[in-house]
Amino acid sequence: MKFMKAVMRMTRLRGKADLGSGPVLSTLIQLSIPSVAMVLFHTLFHLVDTVFISWLGESHMVAISYTFPVQIGVFAILEGVGNGMTALCGRRLGEGNLEEARNTALAAMGFAYLLCLIWIPFLFPYTSNIFFRTLGASDPETLRQAWLYNMWIPPTFILISFSYVVNSVFRCQGNTMIPLKYFLIANGLNLVLDPIFIFTFGWGITGAAAATFVGRAAGIVYLIKKLKTDSEIQLPFKPYIKLSMLPLWGKISAIGFPVTLSTASVALGMGSVNNILSGTFGPQAVAAWMVGLRVEDLAFNTLMGINDALVPFLSFNYGRRDLRRMKNGMRSGLIISAVITGGLGLVVCLFPFSVIQLFRPSEDIARIAANAIRITIAGYPMVIYSVIYNAFFVATGFSTFGLITQIFRSLMIRVPAAHFLSRILTIDYIWWFQPISFLGAALMTGLFSWILLRKLKRDMDDPKDPACAKDF
């Protein structure tokens, strides 16, 4: 009974969390539950979105699998800006410098808007087709469907940029409930509009992208209202870009650019694996991997929610020069991840067909996807370790360690392993390239975390002395 009361006390959501002095485990649980719920709901949305599209036919499902690298690229840029801002803004709040925290957030917003220009080529079929042909797509209908979906990225990216930075601002202040409610509004409306736009209006794959745009716009209205009432840091929706922001853009990029490259390396690695699967086993293997990734994401993305909660906690206490509290935070993050991500991973591993059948795949695709899911989840303990310590790298400004680890995993191990295994194993067992790459990343993470902890221990002998603080 006492144990249950303790669990209930730790999981009770009370608005803002006390990042600097609250009990570490309960503070991180309070931050993590809304973050995990947010990514679960977001993953569920993408799952349902993909299910609706798969009902349009196999060519549409293959087209969506080719758009994954683009979607990852979009969020790679946002993760770079968001993580760079979160690390700097959280550090300034930990130092008690609210004005500099506000300036950092404002600069991050302007930077994110400026980066929206990168996605303009996806408005045009010619440039879109060039991109997708490099990923191995050749069928004219697949290329057309991929363009119809991705042409919505440039206008939607403006809305996503605003929401991403604002949600990061709330997390820096210990508030993860408002980002959760934003996603409930945006993705809830998206789920309602998806079948209407896709089937009732007959817009097909374009309807899925249009529903995303409308849902995001509704969520933005909610965020603008909450900024006025629940945040000490105010951000305008209207673009605010000045040359005086350049120094802050440099600091954000120093932390965020390695994060962007890290996530982009995942996109490049996925595109390379798509090529290997398509060339060796045909489009059926690509479709099966897409289905497997969507189902597996139900478990894996909870880890991203815990990471999102851990970065502001670590950066705030890094600003306070409290290494002991940071170590306790990472240990607590490992415990929470083992329970939530590990538990969900086990459920998905045991019962994959319950979710796979939503896609109405052929019997062969369902069997291949189930094998891919089960083999991949075998490597989850190593993934949990790597992701938790990557949050540590980002929060302290050493995101380059995470970049090197991710490139090592995605490009130097996963792609060669997939190529080698495709020559000696059948389509049912090629998926062992995933756990192999996870093991390599965990070993690299262990080395970098040992180096960084030794450095911080030397630099932070006095945890309460802000004079030791540095920008990296």
Language model: regions and residue ranges:
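Interfacial/gating helices of multi-pass transporter permease domains
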Residues: 53-72, 104, 140-145, 205-206, ...
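Short alpha-helical transmembrane segments in multi-pass integral membrane proteins
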Residues: 1-32, 89-156, 200-257, 314-379, ...
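Transmembrane helical elements of multi-pass membrane transporters/channels
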Residues: 29-49, 152, 186, 215-219, ...
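Short runs within selected transmembrane alpha-helices of multi-pass transporters and secretion channels
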Residues: 82, 152-171, 179-190, 208-223, ...
